A protein has these predicted regions:
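Mid/C-terminal beta-alpha module of Rossmann-like enzyme folds, strongest
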Residues: 256-314
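Conserved Rossmann-fold NAD(P)-dependent oxidoreductase catalytic core, especially the SDR/UDP-sugar
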Residues: 107-127, 134-144, 150-190
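Glycine/proline-rich active-site loop of Rossmann-fold NAD(P)-dependent oxidoreductases
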Residues: 196, 209, 221-233, 261-272, ...
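Conserved C-terminal active-site "lid" loop/helix of NAD(P)H-dependent oxidoreductases
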Residues: 307-336
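NAD(P)H-binding glycine-rich loop region in Rossmannoid oxidoreductase-like domains
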Residues: 51-109, 117-119, 123-128, 132-140, ...
Length: 352
């Protein structure tokens, strides 16, 4: 890693300074997580939580120490406690409910007090003295308000720095308006409400100084292996221009670089739009991809027809229109994207 005066160039895939600790834990090490691994290769001790034991060999081959655990099973997460000061939380919430119980379990694990073994075996006299001290105390149960304030001069364990991969779906439909990170959230479905829940839990944990948290709100992720080619080949329709919605995008490699940049330079409790400069409607995006690969463009239908023909998941994206301002990304993190727009990436694609 090297320090540069003018910020971070994502095309080099190198952070501008070392992470505050060489140990990094990735929770949810899928496609984007593995891209983070490649960008950190040889510059940090990497750990990854996986719920799939069969992935252990793959992770080890990538230079990652696998930890088998499940965010839905709190007891399986014990090894994560105090493992790494830097945590990339890339795991999605569970599929039902409005509260993200997975993030709740992770925060509880990361903030669990250290358990230290006694150095000496107490003598009978010492045990009696300890018993007398305990007898003079009131209840030792920690109240709901949290743990007592540390004694003067006491140095608490170092807090975990958590970078959370959230979604721009927390804003709901904005009717195509431009918005920055100060826009109030208005989640329109349970999926987005769980993301708001995760953000809120992390902010509250940070407010009580249990962790340090930064939040990336992420739009549609694309890459060579994440393009809507199958959708185009199936001739799935898009909306006519009059009914179409604005979408936002980020290349997966640029996203990985942004997350790592946030781990070293992100302001505490700060939200960042991890978005490129693309301003396209959804159908226009599909057309650009189709043209780049020599595929026939998607047919267009009216919204009323789409409501009858398409599945609920796809429709949920077609009901929300917004355009993201990414000034913080550039002004605070000084990120220079490798692919500032979808078109910049598609120009690198060879037509068949």
């Amino acid at each position: 890693m090297r320090v540069v005066d003018r910020g971070y160039n994502a095309s080099t895939m190198k952070a501008t300074r070392k992470l505050r600790s060489p140990r990094v834990l990735i929770v949810g090490c899928g496609d984007v997580g593995m891209r983070c691994v490649r960008q950190l290769q040889g510059r940090a001790r990497l750990y990854a939580l996986t719920s799939h034991a069969e992935r252990r060999d793959e992770l080890r081959a990538a230079g990652v120490t696998p930890i088998v655990g499940d965010l839905d099973v709190r007891a399986s997460l014990a090894r994560l406690a105090h493992l790494a000061p830097t945590v990339l939380h890339l795991a999605p919430p569970q599929k039902t409910g409005e509260v993200d119980t997975r993030t709740r379990a992770l925060i509880a694990t990361l903030t669990a007090p250290r358990v230290r073994r006694a150095r000496h075996v107490a003598t009978g006299r010492l045990r009696r003295a300890q018993h007398g001290i305990r007898a003079r105390k009131t209840s030792s149960i920690v109240p709901d308000g949290g743990y007592p304030a540390p004694r003067a001069g006491h140095r608490p364990s170092r807090r975990s720095r958590v970078v959370y991969a959230s979604t721009t779906g927390v804003y709901g439909d904005c009717a195509g308006a431009w918005l920055d990170e100060t826009r109030p959230v208005a989640p329109a479905n349970e999926r987005a409400k769980r993301r708001v829940s995760a953000e809120t839990q992390l902010r509250r944990a940070a407010a009580r100084r249990a962790i340090t948290a930064s939040i990336a709100r992420i739009p549609g992720i694309y890459a060579g292996n994440r393009l809507p080619l199958a959708r185009l080949e199936k001739r799935t329709p898009a909306l006519v221009d009059a009914d179409d919605v604005y979408t936002n995008h980020i290349h997966a490699d640029d996203l990985a670089a942004i997350l790592l940049r946030m781990a070293t330079h992100g302001r505490p409790s700060r939200v960042i739009h991890a978005s490129d400069d693309t301003t396209l409607k959804m159908g226009e995006y599909f057309d650009r991809v189709a043209d780049a690969f020599g595929i026939e463009r998607a047919p267009r239908i009216a919204r009323d027809d789409a409501e009858q023909q398409l599945g609920e998941m796809m429709l949920s994206f077609m009901r929300e229109s917004r355009r993201l301002v990414n000034t913080r990304l550039k002004g605070e993190l000084h990120v220079r994207l490798r692919y500032p727009s979808v078109d910049d990436f598609l120009r690198t694609v060879s037509k068949p």
